[in-house]
C-alpha cells in the first residue's frame, strides 16, 4: 500500500493538483493507494468517481495540518506502507521521523516554497522537514540547485 499526503488535489484546479492526482493514479498500478487530502468544494462527487481511497480533512487551516498529520501517523503505524509521498515540505513537517522510518518517504519541492533566506526560521523549518524524507524530488534543475544553495543535502 502507498500513502499520499497532499494539500493539493482535485477537484481543485491547478498544476500541483494534476500532478498529485496523476502520481496517485499511477501508483495504483503497483498496489492500493490511500490519499489524505484537504477538503474542497464538490470533493464528495470527485471521490465517489475515483478508484483512489481518499480521506478528506476539513476545518481551519491551522488545525487541519495537525489533524491530517495525526491521521497520517496513525495510518502508517497501523498499516504496511511501501512508500509515502508528500507534496510539500509542510505536509511532512509534523510527521515524526521514527514513524517515517517504517517506510520509504518521498517529498516534492518547488522553488517558490523553499526560497527562504539561509538561517531564517522558515529556512530551518524547511531543512528540518525535508531532512525526514528519504528522497527529496525537485520539480526542476533550477529548484534542485536552489535547494542545494539553501542548505539541502545532495
What kind of region is each of these model predictions?
Residues 6-13, 19-64, 143:
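N-terminal strand-loop element at the rim of the active site
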Residues 70-80:
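Short, well-structured alpha-helical segments in soluble
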Residues 77, 128-129:
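Structural alpha-helical scaffold elements that stabilize or flank donor/cofactor-binding regions
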Residues 86-92:
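Short His-centered aromatic/hydrophobic patch
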Residues 1, 82-83, 135:
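Structural motif
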Residues 133-154:
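A short, active-site helix/loop in glycosyltransferases that binds the activated sugar's phosphate group
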Residues 92-93, 105-120, 132-135:
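A short, histidine- and acid-enriched strand-loop-helix "catalytic/donor-clamping" loop
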Residues 30-31, 81, 102, 133:
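Short, well-ordered alpha-helix to beta-strand connector turns
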Amino acid at each position: 500500500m502507498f500513502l499520499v499526503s497532499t494539500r493539493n488535489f482535485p477537484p481543485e484546479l491547478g498544476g500541483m493538483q494534476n500532478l498529485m492526482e496523476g502520481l496517485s493514479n499511477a501508483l495504483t498500478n503497483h498496489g492500493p493507494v490511500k490519499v489524505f487530502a484537504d477538503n474542497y468544494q464538490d470533493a464528495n462527487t470527485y471521490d465517489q468517481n475515483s478508484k483512489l481511497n481518499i480521506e478528506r480533512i476539513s476545518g481551519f487551516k491551522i488545525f487541519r495540518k495537525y489533524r491530517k498529520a495525526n491521521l497520517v501517523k496513525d495510518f502508517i503505524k497501523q498499516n504496511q506502507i511501501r512508500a509515502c509521498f508528500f507534496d510539500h515540505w509542510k505536509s511532512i513537517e509534523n510527521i515524526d521521523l521514527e514513524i517515517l522510518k517504517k517506510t520509504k518517504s518521498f517529498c516534492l519541492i518547488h522553488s517558490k516554497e523553499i526560497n527562504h533566506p539561509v538561517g531564517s526560521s522558515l529556512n530551518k523549518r524547511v531543512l528540518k522537514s525535508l531532512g525526514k524524507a528519504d528522497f527529496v524530488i525537485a520539480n526542476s534543475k533550477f529548484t534542485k540547485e536552489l535547494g542545494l544553495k539553501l542548505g539541502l543535502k545532495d
